Amino acid sequence: MQAHFASEFMLSLAHALESQLRAAIDRAFPEAAASARESGTGLDPQLAPASKPEFGDFQANAALPLAKPLKQPPRQIAAAIVDQLMVDTAFTAICLTPEIAGPGFINLTVRPECLAAEVQARLADARLGVPLVEGDNDGQQPTPVVVDFSSPNIAKEMHVGHLRSTIIGDSLARVLEFRGHPVLRLNHVGDWGTQFGMLITHLKQVAPEALETADAVDLGDLVVFYRQAKQRFDDDEAFQTTSREEVVKLQGGDPISLKAWSLLCDQSRREFQKIYDRLDVRLNERGESFYNAYLESVVEDLNVSGLLVSDDGAQCVFLEGVTGKDGKPLPVIVQKSDGGFNYATTDLAAMRYRFAAPPQGDGARRVIYVTDAGQANHFAGVFQVAQRAGWIPDAGRLQHVPFGLVQGEDGKKLKTRAGDTVRLRELLDEAVERAESDLRRRLQEEGRDEDESFIEQVATTVGLAAVKYADLSQNRITNYQFSFDRMLALQGNTAPYLLYAVVRIAGIARKGGDLDVTTAELQFSETQEWALVRELLKFDAVIAEVEEELLPNRLCTYLFELSQVFNRFYDQVPVLKAEQPSRSCRLALCRLTADTLKLGLSLLGIPTLERM
């Protein structure tokens, strides 16, 4: 299914101008156009957004590559194309008279009244010009998209690596949902595997009564519980033997082992949910154990399709085009020599299920995995196996969305002073505490008196927003350095800077500016007004880009640039003190800026404030 962006303003303008330019080139140079068509290329207008505001809105560079075949100077070619554009009424309805610049660039400026009309339309449109995705041609609903993210392990605490997966995945899911895709947000928790042998054995020995009575068990700090079990497993051979027997019992469906397993899972789930609630992240848990019933048939399927090879007793699929150091093809092991299954088997079962038509599966057509870049080779391997097994439909897309490490300011992996992994809960607590102390200091400096509920709300919103935004504003593929000072700064590409722009506009309303003002016709004359108009009208194209490229930092960069353009506008152009009709037109720009920032930030999972 193709995403359609026909109603998007700048994109649809670009499409219209491109076809008008092609037609103008055809009319100006029919022979050259015909021979280009015969060679199967056609003449490319080379239309692109203008590199600088003084060059207009778009630049067409078609005249330069035509100079050689036509044996004419490029400026002369550009002039002939412009002459043809000016007799096209559809073109003159959109653009002012083009300018020829430099060696033969054609600069195109959209008519001010077209831009103003689009601003007017967006003021009445809650979607701000972003269309809903269309379904398939036969009128069906858009097909589901699966976003697999967060995925912590049971009995282990969520750490800073889970933070990246959780907030990047949540933001991508929000953008896809906003576009109208049915999104299945899946939390593929690690709730199965050999580690449960030692955890259940430890639980049976330290809290045997829980297995008789409890619907829930409080094991205190699960991380400590895990460490104790691991320590005993490493030190005590008898414990090790019992743990291995426990794995077999669990896999065989022994009721007491299953009860112990579900108590462990429930306690972990409650801890995870506290984090998800704080971050305002929704997830449907579907752990590894869900796929247990499908593992044997995955191996069977691969065998039937002739992909399975027995290698030293293990069942493997050898990858095409991927070799090890010895030059031989690398295997994906789907069943170990002892008959056991592994991560790859579970991931393959999940892929098959997610693409399979309901009720045998989710019926997805796009499945997105948000994990650290260290898993890139693993996913490349299982993706290839799933493709070759025929489990991915023709229009299906499997995408791995990798991200880099979170580093300390020293450029090394983020650790506590004691050298431990940073717990997510503690990191979020510290962000809120620091935001609170910054706020109290600022209130004191400004001589402002605010009640405790205001301080708590602002500190919580700003602290959590700062953590989310610092992560999302980086290109996810790179490692990023975690710095509380940088992310909480009121200046620069930070959440507080963007939140403050929204607060500034709310302040205009409090000072008597009616942001819901309606004007018959918007008119702008100042350079800063037009700069803000043009920036506001890029929003829909940015959302299209994030949906396709799966890069939330593109949205962050746009919102930061919009805030900068707005602040320049507000500092240099009077709004509340302006005469009518300028006052109403400028208030309309303030309102659309606030709407765009609020919607953009909500797609990053960040709520806004009226006051800071």
From Swiss-Prot:
Its EC number is 6.1.1.19. GO terms for biological process: arginyl-tRNA aminoacylation. It is found in: Cytoplasm. A motif ('HIGH' region) lies at residues 152-162. SUPFAM superfamilies: Anticodon-binding domain of a subclass of class I aminoacyl-tRNA synthetases, Arginyl-tRNA synthetase (ArgRS), N-terminal 'additional' domain, Nucleotidylyl transferase. GO terms for cellular component: cytoplasm. SMART domains: Arg_tRNA_synt_N (SM01016), DALR_1 (SM00836). Signal peptide: none annotated. Keywords: Aminoacyl-tRNA synthetase, ATP-binding, Cytoplasm, Ligase, Nucleotide-binding, Protein biosynthesis. It is an enzyme of class 6 (ligase). HAMAP family: Arg_tRNA_synth (MF_00123). Belongs to the class-I aminoacyl-tRNA synthetase family. This is Arginine--tRNA ligase. It comes from Prochlorococcus marinus (strain MIT 9313). The lineage of its organism: Bacteria, Bacillati, Cyanobacteriota, Cyanophyceae, Synechococcales.
